[in-house]
């Protein structure tokens, strides 16, 4: 990796470690390799959102051209959010694309992602199914996002009604993750979710 990128990432890595947000357990970053080309980030689900109480792991890859080009970031932890793919963890956020500026830092990225969890942009979605639910049925979206936060990010327990539907389909022999995705994308309708599971 180019020397300028390494020096910059080392400095930013230390900045995150010393930050007030890290001391409050809001953001975190760890090295994956000694070259500073791959990092593991973590953000806490913001208060008063369906993600509250969850911890979200992020894969952060630093390009050779950093800081002139943004890091490549994706969610490792599964999440139900209009701007994050429920399948791949890919993120739709302008600062990770054309609005990136060389003055931005790892800390900026982590805090921006945390802010995105609190303020979704459903009209610029990464996941159309989630965005549609967010706009058409906000209460169901919140319950679904909360359930995903519980199952995948360790947030406190969520909707007993949704949990029962998951258990019933799992008892039929379907894979738990596949069941959660099918029910979530089919508005928690057991019949259409079952049809989807049988067609895969």
Curated annotation (Swiss-Prot):
Source species, domain of life: Eukaryota
Q: Which residues catalyse the reaction?
A: 92
* Primary location recorded for the protein, binned into one broad class: cytoplasm
Pathway of action: Protein modification; protein ubiquitination
A GO BP term here is: positive regulation of tumor necrosis factor-mediated signaling pathway
Post-translational modification (record): Sumoylation at Lys-14 impairs catalytic activity.
Q: Which reaction does it catalyse?
A: S-ubiquitinyl-[E1 ubiquitin-activating enzyme]-L-cysteine + [E2 ubiquitin-conjugating enzyme]-L-cysteine = [E1 ubiquitin-activating enzyme]-L-cysteine + S-ubiquitinyl-[E2 ubiquitin-conjugating enzyme]-L-cysteine
Q: Which Pfam families match?
A: UBA, UQ_con
Q: Where in the cell is it found?
A: Cytoplasm
Q: What is its EC number?
A: 2.3.2.23
| Family of the protein in this entry | Belongs to the ubiquitin-conjugating enzyme family.
Q: What is this protein called?
A: Ubiquitin-conjugating enzyme E2 K
Q: Which gene is annotated as encoding this protein in its UniProt record?
A: UBE2K
């Amino acid at each position: 990796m180019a020397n300028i990128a390494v020096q910059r990432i080392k400095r930013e890595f230390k900045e995150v470690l010393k930050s007030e947000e890290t001391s409050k357990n809001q953001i975190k970053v760890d090295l994956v390799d000694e070259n500073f080309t791959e990092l593991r980030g973590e953000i806490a689900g913001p208060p008063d959102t369906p993600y509250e109480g969850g911890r979200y792991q992020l894969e952060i890859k630093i390009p050779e051209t950093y800081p002139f080009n943004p890091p490549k970031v994706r969610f490792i932890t599964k999440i139900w959010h209009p701007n994050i793919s429920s399948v791949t963890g890919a993120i739709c956020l302008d600062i990770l694309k054309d609005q990136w500026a060389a003055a931005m830092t790892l800390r900026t990225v982590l805090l921006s992602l945390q802010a995105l969890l609190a303020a979704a942009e459903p009209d610029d979605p990464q996941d159309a199914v989630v965005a549609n639910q967010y706009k058409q049925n906000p209460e169901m979206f919140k319950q679904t996002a909360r359930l995903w936060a519980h199952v995948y990010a360790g947030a406190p327990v969520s909707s007993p009604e949704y949990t029962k539907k998951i258990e019933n389909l799992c008892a039929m022999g379907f894979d738990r993750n596949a069941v959660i995705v099918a029910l979530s994308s089919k508005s928690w309708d057991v019949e259409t979710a079952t049809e989807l599971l049988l067609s895969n």
